[in-house]
Amino acid sequence: WLIKLGGNFNDVGFMGGATNKRCHRPTGGAAVGPEVVKTLYNAVEARKIDLRTDSQVVDLIVKNGAVAGVKVKDEDGKVYEINSKAVVNAAGGFAGNNAMVSKIIPRLKGFATTNHPGATGDGLLLSEKVKAAFVDMDQIQTHPTVVETTGVMVTEAVRGNGAVLINKEGKRFFDELNTRDAVSAAILKQTTGHAYMFFDDDVRKSLKAIEGYIKMPGMVIQGKDLDEVAKNMGVPAANLKATMAQYAKDQAAGKDSCCGRTKMERPLTKAPYYAILVTPAVHHTMGGVKINTKAEVINVDGKVIPGYFAAGEVTGGVHG
């Protein structure tokens, strides 16, 4: 559908937990999000759809038991109504609302998030008012590779294209392409609960998204060789050199003696070298309103709420 709208999603690569290349992304490995937004925005503009920014939906309008519009607060605080035949709730999840997240899973209290500030769960609260049913609210996913100080998520494609995870001791410790929950748990067990995403120049050149990280001040540690990058990372150079020598040997043999990784795209021997300090952060709230195969919202009695539809992360039982 996105490709039909003009989006560029022709590159297909590995992601965590995958046995085959099935994750679509822009040609050359550019970031997926901006391409999705650009594609949808262009489609909206071409169809002259009324797009209202700095506006907050504060309530649903219900007439004769059916959802028939919304009440909106504009940037000046004025509330007005939009009447419609139906309403589609695509307000996203609640990963940006740590109070809501930690109420459901206390151990995630204080965690950073990869999400934008608007991911506060407002769409769920609106749905609660019309007695919508909820499903899988306790299924909250962390992304394992996030820069703690900025909330910048380092795309899984970096690992998919060959990067490894190195701890503060200069050693690998887990299969980097395992599922997100497993990789997150493994990182949290390391010293300070952090790890370095480590890769060489071949990986850098394979993925346009990395260029964006390098342009971010202080995000990417670099070194002309393993000794220099180890010094800049603050890890034992001897350990890092031994780790990477073993990895290159394992990659050539096609068998990972350390961690059982089955997809080793590159030997990681092409200087210069790069590292990004990462830790897990709340990424994806998989629970939400219950819908049927027509995207109609179901209420607590198991019946369709007329005129009310939902799509995306605001829904539950669909993602993951």
Predicted regions: what they are:
Residues K21, T27, T114-P117, M153-E156, ...:
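Short Gly/Pro-enriched turn/cap motifs at secondary-structure boundaries
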Residues L124-L126, A132-V235:
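An anion/pyrophosphate-binding glycine-rich loop and adjacent beta-alpha core
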Residues D59, N239-V318:
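A glycine-rich dinucleotide-binding beta-alpha-beta segment and adjacent secondary-structure elements
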Residues W1-G16, G223-D225, K231-L240, Q246:
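Rossmann-like flavin
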Residues A95-V101, S206-K208, G317-H319:
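Short acidic/His/Gly/Ser-rich catalytic and metal-binding motifs that mark active-site loops
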Residues E75-V147, G151-V152:
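Glycine-rich loop(s) and the adjacent beta-strand/alpha-helix scaffold that form part
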Residues W1-Y80, N97-M100, Q251-K270:
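Conserved redox-cofactor binding core of oxidoreductases
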Residues V67, R172, V297-I298:
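Hydrophobic "anchor" residues
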